[in-house]
Structure formats: structure tokens, C-alpha cells
């Protein structure tokens, strides 16, 4: 990611009237003057040929004298740039485009009165197109020597600055357009997000996975343990659920013969909002026939290594002042061993004693325990409360209980646990994968167990999906599947504290009037 430079840190010192409405009125009056003069305030005829950062890169290391020598030989570098006015200091104007910033030089003796008047009337936030040639200032800053300038869009509201900026973090989320306009860190974050998604797609395609699309509205919610959003299809007169995961549809594609598939898309869960959770989130899910969960752990290590190297240039990163290494191999630790390592005063000899687990969870950890909770559910609660937040370096937790893994294949060594893993980094889950359960009878039994939990009051338990059981009956080859939370991965790679920092338009509470 690019680092802010001195030019980017400068703020316009123009005095802004205390009454914002007064300034808005002034901007509106300028627009009316433009219209009255017969000019088009919103033309669409300027053709940009050059970008700010491309020019900065192309002329890096070329001195002011070298540029001047080329000019003297009639070899001026003609450019056409466009962007938003971020700073106006008379002789120099700074504009910003999608790649960065560049200065414009106003040579007053070389410009006609009309152009000078147009330049003088510019306000911060106006969008201009400029034709000219490259130069370099005495301070070493690259600039475009203005020959022609055209106002492309007149701003009718004042831009935030250090005196009248976005008041708080919530204001940034609600006004992302202003946040992007004025905050370089925010722009960098979402550039990295774009690179992460395109990098994942490139990696999967190189691994011979096929990208697919599956329904966003499901007749039965499934594929994960979560509470769904409910809607209604008027024409079909039936309830539908925004998907909580695409898993069951993707595995039906593997049944159909697409042996390596992936989907990058959003899922929806009608649950709480926090620094780690947003009701609408982006994930990649992928499935590979003739593979097991060990293969996917290996693939995940390669993916994370490649993304960090390609985007950041290193696998050694810092997240919230903590050094983290994304270099393979990652630690692999069973859930029971994680409990043994991190749960204080826990008697491992009683790891399968339900009464002891319930007492530890309720008394020591102050967790609500229901009668329907079995040994596996209680083990998972204890792991989540004692170990999860302490998994700072990349760690695969394996051997999840079958009770809390209704879609995962049972272990050949112990039918009470599954061939499943979750990847934790910085104390947060980033990925969940397992060897898929492809026994239709076992899957039906697991669904019935989930239905029993739902009947007992667990809103997040799964429904019984008869169509999926029927698909399994045709034969799902040995398969492994995984889901990776892209939002949390971007948080990690951009050192962002909150998931809202990496979602362009996060869900917010309704803003109260007045």
C-alpha cells in the first residue's frame, strides 16, 4: 500500500464560513454564474489519457533539469489529466484521481484571462480536466504545466477538511464517498480488497477450479449453523431465505460432475453486529473432489502465502501492533489439545464427561448451558471461550465434534469427531473446511439432530433438506470443501480493527432524526 506523503497531508487553509448553508449558497451561485455565461457546468467532452500515479512512476528519478532540457529540444511530454481539486494555492493546484495526486502549475503570464478567471473561481471538490506538459518544481514535485483547463463538474457542497471534516468513525461509514475522497488510508484499504478478491480468483483458476454462481434465495436455509433473513416470493407465494452459505448447492454441482468449483459472493446471517461480524459478508467457498481436509489446509497455506507476497511483498505482517507470520507451515492443533493448552484448571481426564463439561462451562465460563447440549457442543463452547482468542499466529484447529459439524465427515479413528478444521489468525476465525460427509444415511441422521435442536429453541440449527439428501443418494465422490471469510482476510492484510473498515457500505443503525 502507498504511504501518505507530505503533499497528501497538506490541507487547504481557505476560510470556511461557520454556516455551512452560506457556503452551499455561494457554490450554488457560482453554478448559476457558469450557466448564465453560456458555459456547460457538466460537460462530457474531455478525454483523459494519463493518470496521476502513472506519471509519478514514469518520471521517478528524472530531474527538473532533464525535463527542462527535453522541453528546450521540443520534446515536451504532453498529458491530459483529470481529477478532483484537493488543494488550491494560487500557483499550484493539487488534483486527485483514482490512482493518487498530482500538482498543476498555473503560469499566469501564459494563460488567457478567461482561463485564469476559471482557475480563480475553482473550489475544493470541483472536478477538472487539464491538458498540458510535464514539469518539476524547485522542491522536486512533479506537476502538469497547464495549457488548457476545463471545469467538468461543479461541486455544490463543501468538502470536509481538518476543521470541518467527518466528525467521527460512524460518520465515515455513513458517508463513505466523503471518506474515500479525503482519506488515503481508506482508499488504500479498498484497493487491497480488490486485489485480494482478484488474487483469490486467479489462484483458484490456476488450480483448475471452475467459478460458478448459485442461488442467493433459498427455499430452505442451509449450509451453515446461523439465523437466516426471511423474505417472501409473491408470484410463487412462498417464503424464501437469503442464503447463509452456498454449500449445499455447490456440493450438488460436484455430484453432477463439476469436480472443482468455487464461488465468491455474499452470504447473509441475521445475527449481531460487531467489529468482526456484519449481517452481509463476502466469502469464497470451494469444493474439490478426491481431496480431504489435509489437502485443503495445504492449499490454504499456499493461498495466504501467495496473496501476502503478491499484494504486500512479504509474508511477515503486523496486525494491530502484533507481528504475524503468514509463512507456511501453519500450526495444526486438535480442539482437545487446544483446550488442554489454554483452558485454566480444566481436567482433561473428564474431556468427555458431559456433567463436568456443563459445570465448567456454566460455572467457570459463565456460559448458558441447555439440556439439549451434548458433549461435543460443550467442548466447542469451552474451546471458543478459552482458546480461540489466544490463537494469534496462523493455526489450524482440527478434530471438531460431530455434534457441531453436521455436514462434515466423521473421522475413521473416532466417530465422535470429524475431519474438519478452522483456521485462526489474530484470535479470529478466517476459514472453515472439512472432508465432506457423503453418506446420505448419516447426513439424514445429522439433519434430524439439528431439527431436534431447533425444536428445543436453537434458532441457528439447520433444517432438514430432503432435496440435498436425494442428491447425495446419487453419489458424492470423496470431497473436501472450505469457506474463507474475505472481509476478515482483508482486515488482516490491511491492519484494520473493524470489519466496517473493509466493507464499503456497512450496515448501520437507522439514524435518528433531529
Curated annotation (Swiss-Prot):
It catalyses: tRNA(Lys) + L-lysine + ATP = L-lysyl-tRNA(Lys) + AMP + diphosphate. Keywords: Aminoacyl-tRNA synthetase, ATP-binding, Cytoplasm, Ligase, Magnesium, Metal-binding, Nucleotide-binding, Protein biosynthesis. Its cofactor is Mg(2+). Transmembrane segments: none annotated. Mg(2+) 1 binds at residues 422, 429. Mg(2+) 2 binds at residue 429. GO terms for cellular component: cytosol. One of its GO terms (molecular function) is ATP binding. It is found in: Cytoplasm. Disulfide bonds: none annotated. Homodimer. Belongs to the class-II aminoacyl-tRNA synthetase family. This is Lysine--tRNA ligase. It comes from Psychrobacter arcticus (strain DSM 17307 / VKM B-2377 / 273-4). The gene is lysS.
